[in-house]
């Protein structure tokens, strides 16, 4: 970036990191989005720090014309809102041009998920391979632990792969997860997840006792990259006879939430377990609640029972 935009964006990113605990991925996303907006505005002879509300509307219209989904437009507008709020708070602008902009309307698509039967097959495949004693047993123990932990807790894949090795010492029925914004939450573990983690942990102590990560690797981060886990998960799904296109770590997170709600869990409790700061994010799962209520009425309402008998 040129002129003062570079310095202001750098100061903004430093603030987001130091004061709000933004993760590296979040900071990179902000930087990319602000750079894209700056490039568009520069082509119109306007600087990023001097843009008006009309300039920013033109930018959003440009994104729509380029075929960006409403969710992608909304994400970039969110980055701009944060940036201009920072400039206003620091006295670097006398106004916030994003204050009068409407957010692009996002379609509330239902998340992909897996049936309980498919999850059972997936976990069963991972468990069988971990117990087979064949080659590369460490990788198979790791995959079994990853799958059990993900489905037991519903944590984000970034939270899963970056778990510290110290969780092995907790030796309890709960796991402390450090999520977005450095916020911590407590999630319960299933007995199956505890067993899988212990089996993997014992093997890990023999192979990588000095690593600070539960799932260490030789990569830059020091822990298993989420892309590697996603790739290995698809391979496992193929061996389990599950459609590869239907599987990803995020789909398992959705399965965790959907299966809990389908079996009577409270929406607020699921919100806490998922680490959603706003209940509206969790409300995308309300279709599960609607199906459960429909089944409840059909199976237990006296008139519905009577109609079934007549059929």
From Swiss-Prot:
One of its GO terms (molecular function) is tyrosine-based site-specific recombinase activity. It is found in: Cytoplasm. It comes from the Bacteria. Residues 3-88 form the Core-binding (CB) domain. GO terms for biological process: cell division; chromosome segregation; DNA transposition. Coiled coil: none annotated. Pfam families: Phage_int_SAM_1 (PF02899), Phage_integrase (PF00589). SUPFAM superfamilies: DNA breaking-rejoining enzymes (SSF56349). The active site is at residues 156, 180, 250, 253, 276, 285. CDD domains: INT_XerDC_C. Residues 109-298 form the Tyr recombinase domain. Keywords: Cell cycle, Cell division, Chromosome partition, Cytoplasm, DNA integration, DNA recombination, DNA-binding. Belongs to the 'phage' integrase family. XerD subfamily. Forms a cyclic heterotetrameric complex composed of two molecules of XerC and two molecules of XerD. Site-specific tyrosine recombinase, which acts by catalyzing the cutting and rejoining of the recombining DNA molecules. The XerC-XerD complex is essential to convert dimers of the bacterial chromosome into monomers to permit their segregation at cell division. It also contributes to the segregational stability of plasmids. PANTHER family: PHAGE INTEGRASE-RELATED, TYROSINE RECOMBINASE XERD. This is Tyrosine recombinase XerD. It comes from Rhizobium meliloti (strain 1021) (Ensifer meliloti).
């Amino acid at each position: 970036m040129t002129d003062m935009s570079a310095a202001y964006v750098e100061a903004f990113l430093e603030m987001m990191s130091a004061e709000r605990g933004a993760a590296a991925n979040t900071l990179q996303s902000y930087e990319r989005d602000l750079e894209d907006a700056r490039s568009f505005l520069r082509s119109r002879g306007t600087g990023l720090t001097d843009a008006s509300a009309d300039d920013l509307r033109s930018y959003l219209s440009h994104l729509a014309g380029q075929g960006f989904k409403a969710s992608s437009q909304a994400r970039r507008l969110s980055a701009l809102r944060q940036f201009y709020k920072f400039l206003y708070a620091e006295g670097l602008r006398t106004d916030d041009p994003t204050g009068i902009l409407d957010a692009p309307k996002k379609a509330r698509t239902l998340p992909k998920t897996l049936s309980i039967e498919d999850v059972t097959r997936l976990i069963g495949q991972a468990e069988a391979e971990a117990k087979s004693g064949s080659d590369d047993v460490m990788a198979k123990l790791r995959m079994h632990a990853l799958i059990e932990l993900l489905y037991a807790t519903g944590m984000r894949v970034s939270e899963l792969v970056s778990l510290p090795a110290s969780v092995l010492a907790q030796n309890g029925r709960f796991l402390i997860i450090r999520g977005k914004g450095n916020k911590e939450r407590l999630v319960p573990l299933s007995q199956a997840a505890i067993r899988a983690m212990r089996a993997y942990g014992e093997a890990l102590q023999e192979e990588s006792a000095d690593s600070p990560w539960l799932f260490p690797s030789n990569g830059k981060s020091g822990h298993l990259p989420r892309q590697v886990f996603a790739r290995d998960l698809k391979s496992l799904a193929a061996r389990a006879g599950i459609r590869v296109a239907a599987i990803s770590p995020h789909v398992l997170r959705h399965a965790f939430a959907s299966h809990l709600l389908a079996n009577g869990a409270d929406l607020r409790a699921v919100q806490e377990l998922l680490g959603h700061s706003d209940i509206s994010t969790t409300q995308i799962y309300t279709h599960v609640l609607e199906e459960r209520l429909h089944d409840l009425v059909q199976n237990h309402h006296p008139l519905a029972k009577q109609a079934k008998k007549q059929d």
